[in-house]
Amino acid sequence: MQYNIILLVDGSLSLEQANQVNEKQQQTLTNVEGLQTEYLGLKELAYPIKKQLSAHYYRWKFSGDNQSTKDFKRTANINKQVLRELIINLEREYGYLASINPKKQQLALQKRAKYDEIIARENNPENPDVPVTSGLASTQPRLSRTEKAQKPKEELWDVVQKMGNFDSVQANPYRPRFKRFNAEHVNQRQNQQNNNNNRFDRNRNRQHNRFKDKQ
């Protein structure tokens, strides 16, 4: 089975000391083949780990069985200079399995060809047979946050130029449209107020009658 291990060593150590810790941890692996070690550098952590803010990153690649990392897990948990370890079994990862599956590879190629064909037609509607120079071609450029915020305002301005601003029509009392709107609004408020008054009178009369019955 193919394994990847990410090892984080205490960042307060020097590079030589971190390499010694890395080599010591590699000796705990058993029955491994093709071990490859890559130093990824000293990086800041997103959050403190064992009160440390930085760590030396190492990546291991090797082939082994289920028992290859058993001793490594035990010693890594005991060693205080090891901040964190991550063991990845590539043969259990769906992405890795799909990358070595011939059927998945063929399906991915078919989807890619279909995608390139659609992009070619959209970019060249007059001549759809022109080959695509880049698979990442797009019909429209991506907009920034500022452009996205400005776009609704531009669309609203186009509507105002074509249809007129409804707010300005309401603000002008000399236009029939405003008078009609204002009259309808006043009638609705009067009807609602009359209904509320009638409801209040009925409730008051009902309570008054109940009080008389009790007497």
Curated annotation (Swiss-Prot):
Coiled coil: none annotated. GO terms for biological process: translation. The gene is rpsF. It comes from the Bacteria. The keyword tRNA processing does not apply. Residues 188-198 have a biased composition (Low complexity). It comes from Mycoplasma pneumoniae (strain ATCC 29342 / M129 / Subtype 1) (Mycoplasmoides pneumoniae). GO terms for molecular function: rRNA binding; structural constituent of ribosome. Keywords: Ribonucleoprotein, Ribosomal protein, RNA-binding, rRNA-binding. Binds together with bS18 to 16S ribosomal RNA. InterPro entries: Ribosomal_bS6, Ribosomal_bS6_CS, Ribosomal_bS6_sf, Ribosomal_S6_plastid/chlpt, Transl_elong_EF1B/ribsomal_bS6. Residues 144-153, 199-215 have a biased composition (Basic and acidic residues). HAMAP family: Ribosomal_bS6. This is Small ribosomal subunit protein bS6. Gene3D superfamilies: 3.30.70.60. Belongs to the bacterial ribosomal protein bS6 family. Residues 121-153, 187-215 are annotated as: Disordered. The keyword Nucleus does not apply. One of its GO terms (cellular component) is ribonucleoprotein complex.
